Amino acid sequence: MALTLLRHAALAKEYENCYNGWKDLSIDPSRFDDRKVALLRKQKFDLIYSSDLLRCQQTLEMMDIDDYVTDERLREVRFKEEIEGLNFHQVEQLDSFRAAYLETREAWHAYICAESQEAFERRIRSFLSELPQNKEILICSHGGTLQKMMTILGYTKNKIDYLEHIRIDNVI
């Protein structure tokens, strides 16, 4: 199977660089760059999956794709309620913030996320395990989810930008 991983389109600037997990935000259509997805529009996919959150579905619809399956397992990691929607500077100002949380990825994740790393990974592995073999598959999801998926599949990339897409061949 071949997977093409696509990060959803950009949100309104006010939500950029914020911890936007399960908050159901819309994309900003004025920031949709058709050039970034021009090749994807021409490609034939056997199956297309999307996070159930609006920003992913709107991204596919802006690409004139309306035949896709939503799956909540493709959501971004769930942030704690007091973190959701904040940027890093705002998080630093919280009474609960401690600089020590920045010392390890595990400590930072435990501080900002309501979902453990293990639960997040299990959710994504569960989705991947159910994908049919020998298919061309497009997955539209969120930055953190796609990064975790790439790590699970042995593909390392530190960041995936809005509308960036990465193809991974020979996924077993």
Predicted regions and their residues:
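Phosphate-handling substructures
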Residues: 23-26, 63-123
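Active-site-proximal alpha-helix that buttresses catalytic centers in soluble enzyme cores
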Residues: 2-70
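A short, acidic, amphipathic alpha-helical segment used as a generic capping/interface helix at domain edges
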Residues: 120-133
